[in-house]
Amino acid sequence: MQSISNCPIGLVSKNTINSASTIAEWVACPWKYINVVGSGRYVSNKPDKITRYDLLKAAQEAEMQELLTRNDMKGRHKRNKKSKIALETIAEENSSTESLF
C-alpha cells in the first residue's frame, strides 16, 4: 500500500481526493481528507500515526455501512457482536500506545 505522510491511501475515497481544492493542500494535511476513520483520535491526538485500533475501527465502520446499504439485518447483528469484542481486545492491547507505524 502506498502512503503519503504515513497516511494509507486505501483509507481515502477517490471523491474525497478529487474534492480537495489543490494537491498542495492534500499533501500538506492529508488527514483532513480521511472520511473513513471517524474516531477523532486520528486528527487530534496523533496525526502522524495510525494505531491498530484506528484501522480496525475504520474497517468496522465500512463493514457496517455496507451492511446497512444491503439491509442485511441478521448478518449485521451477528457481525456487530464479533467486531465489538475484537475492538475491545485491540483497545486493551493498545493501552501501551503501541502503533503500526
Swiss-Prot record:
Induction annotation: Expression is induced in the presence of citrinin. Expression is induced by the PDR1 and YRR1 multidrug resistance transcription factors.
What GO CC annotations are associated with the protein? mitochondrion
As for subcellular location, the record says:
Mitochondrion
Assigned keywords, A-Z: Mitochondrion
Functional summary from the UniProt entry: Mitochondrial protein that is involved in citrinin resistance.
Name of this protein:
Citrinin resistance protein, mitochondrial
